[in-house]
Amino acid sequence: MARIAIIGLVGKSMFFDVPRFHVGGETITARGYYEEWGGKGFNQAVAAARQGAAVAFLGAVGAQDAKPVHGFCAKEGVCATLAAKRTQSACAAILTDDVGETRVTVCPGAALVPRDVDGFAGAIATADALVLNNEVPEAVNVAAVELAVKYEVKVLFNPAPARSMPKVIRDAVTVWTPNEFEESALGDVPGEVVTTLGAKGCRIRSTGEVIPASPAKAVDTTGAGDTFTAVLAVRLAEGESLRDACVAANEASSQSVSVKYVMPSLPTRA
């Protein structure tokens, strides 16, 4: 069984179904509303667990939300370490239009600090892969990659949202999983880059190969990128080649876009 350690944001995701997106100064009435726990790292943790991995997750929540988040993680088979903070949990508003495209606004809320990583060191040390993203403070990711380097753990990094990163992170990452916009911001990095291309699939930078996605009717693309990163991490941790892992990640992402919202869309491994 692959052992995956994931650090990320966890908070309340609020979904609004809209006929189209706003223009400046416009108010639109939503056709539906749904909420769930989410965040990039949180989504990736649940997705990896549903793929059969042993998942350890580190995140920060408002103290009032620690119990329900722990309960949800336990139900999904995710071993969660939650840093309870004296502030509100993070939240995100996700608008989805009639063709399944999304617009997302995030309020960070409760945030990890580097010392929170100290209590997660054992999970990193025993992991086959560490998965990180940019929804947590840079100093937290630095602390995590330093442990990964110390224990010789491969690092997958989903550089979203896009931002510049220090050399200590750039040098430690084994595989990056940006989308096309994030890839342009990432530039040249030592590790392998697998760029997600939406309905077109993904591209492996070192070979230039585009691996096509399976045909799918897009209902909601919100969780597709997190599904891709999680499945890629699990398959690489299991020893698959990068190309084979990309094929599996593409397939899982195609499944995810056909289901509304994130948690219901994260596929279970057959």
Name each region found by the language model.
Residues 49-50, 149, 237:
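Gly/Ala-rich phosphate-binding loop of Rossmann-like dinucleotide-binding domains
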